[in-house]
UniProtKB/Swiss-Prot annotation:
Catalyzes the hydrolysis of fructose 1,6-bisphosphate (Fru 1,6-P2) and sedoheptulose 1,7-bisphosphate (Sed 1,7-P2) to fructose 6-phosphate and sedoheptulose 7-phosphate, respectively. Mn(2+) 2 binds at D97, E100, E225. GO terms for cellular component: cytosol. Mn(2+) 1 binds at D33, E57. Pathway: Carbohydrate biosynthesis; Calvin cycle. PANTHER family: FRUCTOSE-1,6-BISPHOSPHATASE 1 CLASS 2-RELATED, FRUCTOSE-1,6-BISPHOSPHATASE CLASS 2. One of its GO terms (molecular function) is metal ion binding. Homotetramer. The keyword Methyltransferase does not apply. Its EC number is 3.1.3.11, 3.1.3.37. This is D-fructose 1,6-bisphosphatase class 2/sedoheptulose 1,7-bisphosphatase. It comes from Synechococcus sp. (strain JA-3-3Ab). Its cofactor is Mn(2+).
């Protein structure tokens, strides 16, 4: 992929975050999501690339913007060969979550981000819109912990990898009825639990960095977000595993899920022969080149949220590349057209 693309996708997540942040604390999660989607789509279509949404806002019939299978980018036009360079015509798979944690934005709570991951065609698993059991852990524990291990064993491994006690660890778990037993096991092992209502991509990311105070993510969340998390943690060299969960009795989400056998059949039709397989992050995000970007909408462990001032806004963005093996934190001041801010604060 073109190195220039890494700079251009920064603007994609920045604009989505700014749009959503205008609705922070207003109690309207649907509008926050809608404006983020619209801003992200508009920016994607200004980039000289040939992109295809593989994880997005639903199917074509369910979502007018950024639906699965939608083509984005200038080079998707029929006459693209006339003005796009050869490298810009290479097909790219894109996974997006324009407003991860819409409820967090609506309530003015921490942990919401605008997120995007890209790879060459076939480089990201086309995860179905079901659930996934997830395990994220620091790079020091990569390949040592496992989804099939009980929480107590994984916590002991993580503690030893980080040269600390289990009681020093904090594990993020989504606050769901299905996690009652998991939470009990973590606490009985001696670790602390941080419950979140939404936003497990942010939590998985935090587990991949030292100094966030988060040492693992455990539990069941959405499968598409699992692929995006895997893309980020693969670039970081951290640990991520996922297993698709499709049994309504396990999920306990209160939303409709098809009968188990029907889902198993659909997964096989999509090429997933073993629906109970434990996926490594290198399988979920298998591309030779993987790029991840996220801009904070509200404050989080890694990035501050969007801050507005007279004449503009300020954003913090995280960009991780498997190709260049870089992690960049980008602090950007956005000035409104025709307006000059009275002052620019250094921090």
């Amino acid at each position: 992929m073109d190195n220039k693309l890494g700079l251009e996708i920064i603007e994609v997540v920045e604009q989505a975050a700014i749009a959503a942040a205008r609705w922070m604390g207003k109690g309207d999660n649907k509008t926050a999501d809608q404006v983020a989607v619209e801003a992200m789509r508009e920016k994607l279509n200004q980039i000289p690339m040939r992109g295809r949404i593989v994880i997005g806002e639903g199917t074509r019939d369910e979502a007018p913007m950024l639906y699965i299978g939608e083509e984005v980018g200038i080079c998707t036009r029929p006459d693209a060969e006339q003005f796009c360079r050869v490298e810009e015509l290479v097909e790219i798979d894109i996974a997006v979550d324009p407003c991860e944690g819409t409820n967090l934005v609506a309530k003015g709570q921490n942990g919401s981000m605008a997120v995007l991951a890209i790879s060459e065609k076939g480089g990201l698993l086309h995860a179905p819109d079901i659930y996934m059991q997830k395990l994220a852990a620091p790079p020091q524990a990569k390949g040592k912990v496992h989804l099939d291990y009980p929480p107590e064993k994984n916590l002991q491994i993580i503690a030893e990898s980080l040269d600390r006690e289990v009681s020093d660890l904090t594990v993020v778990v989504m606050d769901r009825k299905r996690h009652v037993d998991l939470i009990r096991q973590i606490r009985e092992a001696g670790a602390r639990v941080k419950l979140i209502t939404d936003g497990d991509i942010s939590a998985a990311l935090s587990a991949g960095f030292n100094g966030t105070g988060i040492h693992a993510l455990m539990g069941i969340g959405a499968a598409p977000e699992g692929v995006i998390s895997a893309a980020a943690l693969r670039c970081l060299g951290a640990h991520f595993q996922g297993r698709l969960i499709y049994d309504p009795e396990v999920v306990q989400a209160g939303t409709y899920l098809p009968p188990v056998e029907e889902t198993r059949r659909q997964l096989k039709e999509q090429g997933i022969e073993d629906p109970d397989k434990v996926w490594e992050c290198e399988e979920l995000a298998s591309g030779k080149e993987v790029l991840f970007a996220a801009t904070g909408i509200t404050d989080g462990d890694l990035m501050r949220g969007v801050r507005f001032f007279g004449g503009g806004a300020r954003t913090e963005t995280l960009v991780i590349s498997s190709q260049s093996r870089t992690v960049r934190f980008v602090d950007t001041i956005h000035m409104k057209d025709g307006q000059q801010p009275r002052s620019l604060q250094l921090r």
